[in-house]
Amino acid sequence: MRLVYNTTFHVDDEIAAGLIKSIKEFYIPYIKAKGLCCDILFTRVIVHEEEGRSFSLQLVFPSEEDYVIFIDIYKDKLLGVLIELFGQNLLHFSTTLEEIE
């Protein structure tokens, strides 16, 4: 059973490039170095919003154990870095999904 931890981010147009850079150059390499995820997917959310841009970051965990390690040790630390960089300009919510086999 694989678990997917999906975080959706919404930012103003002016800082979208900064968020993309931070996710690609810091967040994803940091997670990959920990060896917990079997796949990572970073995408633009296709919606017609009047303001801002939305992105989805999906971390796929091969086991519940790896997922729990991420949640307990790394989740708040990584999100904290993004909040420190973008402050109240960063809206986010997360959902945990279970793959149906």
For the regions a protein language model found, what residue spans apply to each?
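Glycine-rich beta-strand-turn "strand-cap" elements at beta-sheet edges
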Residues: C38-G52, G80-E101
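Surface-exposed beta-strand edges and their flanking turn/coil or helix-capping segments
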Residues: G18-S22, K34, S54-L57, F70-D72, ...
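Short, well-ordered beta-strand segments in beta-rich or mixed alpha/beta enzyme
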Residues: R2-F9, F42-I73
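Short amphipathic alpha-helical segments
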Residues: I15-F42, K77-V81
